[in-house]
Amino acid sequence: ISSIKSLPYKNQGLAGRLTYDYDSRYFIEGNFGYNGSENFAAGHRVGFFPAVAVGWYVSNEKFFSPLTDVVSKLKLKASVGQVGNDQIGGDVRFIYLGTVANTGSYVYGNYTKTSGERVNEVANPNVGWEVSTKQNYGFELGLFNKLEIQGDWYHDVRDHIFVRNNNIPAYVGMTTVPMVNIGKMKSWGFDGSLEYHDKIGQVNVTGRGTFTYANNEILRNGDALNKYPWMNSVGQKIYQKFGWEAVGLFESQGEIDRSPIQFS
């Protein structure tokens, strides 16, 4: 493993951007990334990840001029795009290759253990990029040239997450189940800020506050289904804690006698 890590790293990429501004009212920007990674096998090394963003400066419109004494700024914006991630194997390089280990032993014939090599990681030549599809919708609002309000709602879906496929049953005979691009999760939330600035005499007064709400949900993670649905992590937040929920303490012998059997 150490000798593999000492090999030179190689990544290639091509990026482009095109922006357009019409009369400081309408804005559009397009981006793309065309990236190649050594971490994947031939045929899966290159990924194309586009993005586009648009904006409308409403307060710069002629029809809006009668309102500018009150609404000094109004801008609407939206964006959607994809981002690729090739660093999905941790510190392991060439994650599409299988590995063997000279460990373990098996019993044959006269019950003597015979050592040998075993499959440590199953090869997966189809492993590829993890892809994140991001959306963002926001606004910028200014009032009386003193108060600035900004808000952004975002939604992010990460697909092809590299996880172990624990749905493979033990009778298949694998000592280690393969890593595959089957994980998926989504996250969403809102970021907001409020800023006030004014000048009182020779003193500049500024105040700022922020607000953030974030949530997420596991959509698919390769785990085998549990006996009870509430034990499954799919549909829950990432790093969700599981455990028994206490309902209280016994306050009398009668409550103990009427209660179900308790587990120690």
Descriptions of predicted regions:
Residues I1-E245:
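Extracellular/periplasmic, surface-exposed regions of secreted and cell-surface proteins
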Residues S252:
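Aromatic-residue-lined binding/catalytic grooves and analogous aromatic/hydrophobic interfacial grooves
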